[in-house]
Amino acid sequence: MEIPPSPPPETAAYTLTTSSISYTIPKTSLSLLRFPATEPPSFILRNITLTAHPTEILAVVGPSGAGKSTLLDILASKTSPTSGSILLNSIPINPSSYRKISSYVPQHDSFFPLLTVSETFSFAACLLLPNPSIVSETVTSLLSELNLTHLSHTRLAQGLSGGERRRVSIGLSLLHDPCFLLLDEPTSGLDSKSAFDVIHILKSIAVSRQRTVILSIHQPSFKILSIIDRLLLLSKGTVVYHGRLDSLEGFLLFKGFTVPPQLNSLEYAMEILQELRESDGNTDATALPSIENRKQREKQSIVRYRKSRITEISLLARRFWKIIYRTRQLLLTNALEALVVGLVLGTIYINIGIGKAGIEKRFGMFAFTLTFLLSSTTETLPIFINERPILLRETSSGIYRLSSHILANTLVFLPYLFVISIIYSVSVYFLIGLCPTWQAFGYFVLVIWIILLMANSFVLFLSSLAPNYITGTSLVTILLAAFFLFSGYFISKESLPKYWLFMYFFSMYKYALDALLINEYSCLASKCLVWLEEAQTKICMVTGGDVLKKKGLHEKQRWFNVYVLLGFFVLYRVLCFLALLRRVSGSKR
């Protein structure tokens, strides 16, 4: 049965119950050989049964490795249990509908550092709230509820403590007024006062909004315990105790343990977890994975977005532009870099001429241009990698479509990189003395622009794969070096071993270099570049057309190379989308 998708906030009150939840990791040592595993699956959780009520905080407590985060993932419908069921008011949940009335706050905060607290809330509210007219009122009310009003215009990169950043994370999860709030170790990394303030605010939210709060916590202080309503004490994936804190001491006495006067009951229970597990005969579970149960839940996990794709792209593009505008130093650096490199290159090759030396210099100048343009975009790699956790959190939560993010990113970088391409082209083209026609200059700008877009897509794709900045930088460096090596600049296609020939056709450098050469020497196709003087006669030895023919090029290939470069641009965007989609799917599974 399916829960009501949009319950009224005033009356919605759900009691969440789990019945014999188990989660296993199958033995995979022989799975690659398609032989059945000889060992039983490894249990992460065994027979977890719990109840969480509205207006209350249920704290999942236990040592590291007890299964707290896995249980939170299951309760947040991010992971499907291998057996057991989750019920709301005694009705089995539908994961798709359940996500609409629940919200999950991960352990690590991730925001755009250049946005203010108010802007961060407003962006999410525009995508989550049905009526745009209530966005401002909702954000103002939420800032007040979280005691963040005085920080509303403070950027997240500066001036916020760990506790305040954690409250921003909680605020983002409250924007659509969920019935359930699930938090993975919200006090992790906070001092005692900040940790207490966070739990106190969560308790206020639970009571004032009639909501259910479930959180995991490693070992809460006595002050925090005074706020928490119920405990679920885990040890090695099994329930040791589930109930109120004031009943824990009686439970320990029943088991034959007396709480020492210097410890509270939870501290003592944490010290004797092994003995408590051994004394409990109900912790041995024989639940086996239910593949059908998991498949059925995955079929139901269809995310329905609240806004149209056009609205998502518009809002995301505005956020991108705002962030780019606030990185004015990076903007200025990119523009100055293009201008200075263009002028330096132009003065080195000034009035290059068209003779034999000019042919060699043009080839070298074009090769350097490609190396500079393709390598200059690597500075965006750390930005993309730092933004990736935010993207995964927002898309896995169903705030917007992943494809909308890719399209908005593309729309923002199109004009930005076009300006950079014009700055570089103007500074280098006329100083060197390349083909003096506006048609050739326009084509040169177009090729430079597409090269920058292609390089940007390439870096974006690698940033979706790389686990960190160091690995990403290594990948970019190695692949760009390989593409340059097989571009035909160092070794011709005819000289390549057959088993490396595929790299010649996969090289981005090859098509960009061909496009620049065709543009230049098509202009000089009938012009003699090298003369042979004999007995007062001059014989033309090399024309522009001969240069192209020697490189295996033809004027008719002018637009073919542009189309291939555009194909690389689209290909790397699609590959980036697929890589991120896999990551998002992994965070939802």
Curated annotation (Swiss-Prot):
ABC transmembrane type-2 domain boundaries: 311-521
Residue ranges of domain ABC transporter in the record: 16-261
Ligand binding (ATP): 62-69
Presence of keyword Membrane: yes
Matching Gene3D superfamilies: P-loop containing nucleotide triphosphate hydrolases
Annotated Gene Ontology cellular component terms: membrane
Keyword tags: ATP-binding, Membrane, Nucleotide-binding, Transmembrane, Transmembrane helix, Transport
Transmembrane segments: 335-355, 365-385, 412-432, 441-461, 470-490, 499-519, 560-580
Record's subcellular location: Membrane
Single GO MF annotation: ATP hydrolysis activity
Membrane topology: Multi-pass membrane protein
Major subcellular site: membrane
Pfam families the record matches: ABC2_membrane, ABC2_membrane_7, ABC_tran
UniProt family annotation: Belongs to the ABC transporter superfamily. ABCG family. Eye pigment precursor importer (TC 3.A.1.204) subfamily.
Protein name (database record): ABC transporter G family member 8
Gene that encodes the chain: ABCG8
